[in-house]
């Protein structure tokens, strides 16, 4: 494939083959250090762990080395941080992928604690093993831990479809439908009941950020809330307005405290926003149900179901712990409210349909960056997160606009790109394609990042031919941009052109290596 100059735009047809560079000799093989299993599940626990048909069962709990987790997270790269507060979070959570024969490419979430959180490594390991014995389809299960010097890390199943907080409070295109909200409440109540039955009843800081959505869009409860910071004993990191009254009095968490926090989640589901419990109770007592319901749900829910949920939330938020219902009562009340059981969660949540894992291309010949690793694994979700986090950093210098060119048409074009960015961030890939196409069609400004993002959108919509065209367009705009080659590698693999895909991966890694050397200097 020939390269175009950065000032030219090319047609939409795809050349027959992408460009190739000379292949360097492969590096010597690296030894693999397998994980050390701590224990295996008994038959009863294994049966309890059966999840949705398309979801892989959680592996046995294991102890990991720091080197393994560093490799899995790309050296704890900032691009792999998935904590809601980003790098400002006190305990960072990273996306990762287990490498080597023992890892099997499994996606993981790695929680990295601050150095003073768990001073006693034995206490940390014992607590982690206790939580690691739990296995349930309604939970993002803990699959391992790491104690290395001052480092304390937990390893859990990775949930790729964000948090309940993200879907409730930060949506741009579509509010969660009513039946899905009822499903969330029921699934989390089931998870809490399971933990209680397994003698792990205390869940710390239960809130909408602890509710995660798996590859099928099913809601799951994060296992991280089953462990607390052992040094300061804090169980609630959120605003004190949302903590149980008894915790403010004596600093202790009880099963009734967990029920109170569950009540705050019910209020979140009803209102679509964070309302302090005292204010929510005042609204419930003095006004109609409609006052607390999210306006986007108007006319889309059953008054009887909403009344039941509001009444249950009110009981959970009672000041006196003895006046709150127990976990079993929550489950029994929420179970009859479940509707649309035949509709998959991913449909109601509005996330892409889960697919079988595509065949990955052969291993490249160079060490890869997080972007390269994601592309070599065909991990479209990881690629999406990286493209969101890098934003338009690589577009600098590709366009220089004079004052005369800053027209209303230009403003409209940038507005289309902005709308595309919002849709891309929120995984509304079809809308992102439409908005980015409006931007591209004007032609005043050429952005390699827009082509890369639209390429990924096409991949998410099972359009590999269009994805390859856009990745090649990105290369034409920015001939030595590694991301353009990486996106071509993914599209080629989707088109079953594995040899060409490997060439693209190697070429991209060479470009990245060359870029790093130029930054460091001689």
UniProtKB/Swiss-Prot annotation:
UniProt: ATP binding residues: 85-93, 111
Gene coding for it: BSK1-2
Protein's UniProt name: Serine/threonine-protein kinase BSK1-2
UniProt function note: Probable serine/threonine kinase that functions as a positive regulator of plant immunity. May be involved in the regulation of pattern-triggered immunity (PTI). Does not seem to be involved in responses to brassinosteroid (BR) signaling.
Source species: Oryza sativa subsp. japonica
Top class in the EC scheme: transferase
One cellular-component annotation, GO: plasma membrane
Regions annotated as coiled coil: none
Organism lineage: Eukaryota, Viridiplantae, Streptophyta, Embryophyta, Tracheophyta
Family: Belongs to the protein kinase superfamily. Ser/Thr protein kinase family.
Active site feature: 205 (proton acceptor)
Enzyme Commission number(s) from the entry: 2.7.11.1
